[in-house]
């Protein structure tokens, strides 16, 4: 068998028009063409119907190119808006990235589809879905749209990969080259929030299913050994916010007889619970939040516990009655 080494290009953007004229755009990772593809996807959706809103799905998106993240943000933000900044120990690591062509351009491709996106993209109601597997570039986009109050972030707190790596080329013998990747800076959202080990906290916490969160989705940067910790005083409020969304659903799993989510779905299908809640948010309907899901699970666990205790008491009473009859004989 002959195998040829090659770069596998994946279609990173998928879109469709949902019921009630709500657009759905899913990004699986940030590649060279991702930003242009998002711009084209929005244009196509806007041509199909007068959009009542758009859901931008970044769940399970591990990140990718910084330029692509800036470009996707630029689709929905006014030109020249601050998207993200970096800070490090040296002046060359102090940078600001704006929603402009020079910061999101990848190569010399033309035309600039982002500049040609309909003006409605800057004002259409927008919900961004994230989960603990949304990392790096995904968090840059979510943080920018949240800080500019351009979108409502829904789901569970993101991964928290906010470190910047720089490749230092090294020359070895025989003319071969290699390199070492160093962490040199951190990413900060437009308002100055660090992403590192904190992630993006949703405006509205929503579980993966009506039965709670999938346990497998709850690993984050802050759970990894020797991760880069953040000690900025500015982020004390993030610690308080973390209590609400960190490991969402954990309390329910600690309850005796609590349910483990069994519902499995594909992102974007009709059983996608967070997507349904995102649609409800855009349409002004009732949203089932994390707090409500947990309250329901706790109530169900309490009811099940009381029922089991009642049944056990009845069995014990029946047994005592039987034993008493036996003794009387």
Locate the predicted segments by residue.
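C-terminal "post-core" interaction segments
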Residues: 2-4, 9-329
């Amino acid at each position: 068998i002959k195998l040829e080494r090659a770069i596998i290009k994946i279609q990173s953007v998928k879109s469709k028009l949902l019921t009630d004229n709500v657009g759905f755009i899913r990004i699986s990772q940030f590649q060279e063409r991702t930003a242009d593809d998002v711009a084209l996807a929005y244009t196509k959706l806007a041509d199909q119907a007068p959009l009542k809103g758009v859901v931008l799905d970044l769940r399970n998106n591990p990140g990718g190119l910084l330029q692509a993240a800036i470009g996707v943000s630029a689709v929905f933000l006014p030109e020249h808006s601050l998207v993200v900044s970096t800070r490090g120990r040296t002046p060359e690591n102090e940078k600001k990235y704006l929603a402009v062509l020079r910061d999101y351009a990848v190569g010399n491709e033309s035309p600039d589809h982002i500049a040609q996106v309909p003006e409605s993209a800057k004002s259409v109601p927008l919900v961004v879905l994230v989960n603990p597997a949304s990392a790096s570039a995904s968090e840059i986009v979510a943080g920018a749209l949240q800080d500019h109050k351009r979108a409502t972030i829904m789901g569970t707190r993101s991964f928290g990969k906010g470190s910047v790596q720089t490749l230092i080329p090294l020359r070895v013998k025989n003319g071969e080259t290699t390199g070492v990747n160093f962490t040199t800076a951190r990413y900060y959202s437009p308002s100055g929030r660090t992403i590192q080990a904190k992630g993006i906290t949703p405006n509205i916490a929503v579980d993966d299913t009506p039965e709670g969160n999938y346990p497998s989705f709850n690993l984050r940067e802050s759970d990894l050994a020797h991760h880069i910790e953040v000690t900025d005083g500015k982020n004390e409020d993030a610690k308080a916010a973390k209590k609400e969304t960190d490991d969402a659903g954990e309390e329910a799993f600690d309850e005796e007889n609590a349910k483990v989510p069994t519902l499995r779905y594909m992102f974007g299908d009709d059983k996608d619970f967070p997507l349904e809640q995102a649609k409800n948010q855009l349409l002004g309907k009732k949203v089932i939040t994390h707090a409500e899901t947990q309250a329901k699970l706790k109530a169900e666990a309490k009811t099940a516990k009381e029922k089991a205790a009642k049944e056990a008491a009845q069995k014990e009473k029946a047994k005592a009655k039987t034993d008493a009859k036996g003794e009387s004989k």
